[in-house]
Amino acid sequence: MTIERITSENYQDFCDMLYWRAKGKEEKAPIEDVPDELNDRNLYVYAAREEGRFVGWISLTYLPKVSRVKKGYVYVDELWVAEKYRNHGIAKALIAEADEMKTKLDATGIRLYVNENNPIAHNLYTACGFSGEDKAYFMEK
């Protein structure tokens, strides 16, 4: 297994994986343009390649803080691994990218939200050193 940062060069393979996740079948995904967001200095998307294709990904965002400390947080926006490839260390390898990003950016920490009805993800994050303090509500407008 290898972990790759998503760029314009491997974006088609990444889209193929997203299509596979959404449609349940592996085939070339139609794409128009590589999104400009991939060049955002605070967005990091990594994917795990196994058997010649991407089988999971993590999307990370660095959110700077305006304060005396001037250190922000790395946020895990999404983490997904294809069911066939779960329990093979892929999710932990992807989370390791968040740890590296935290170190590289000298961030205060890593934050994420996990649904309380998702015990598999909760157990994964706990095994990777995350701890929960309070329940939170996800709200959207």
Predicted feature locations:
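Conserved beta-strand in the GNAT
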Residues: 47, 53-62, 75, 80
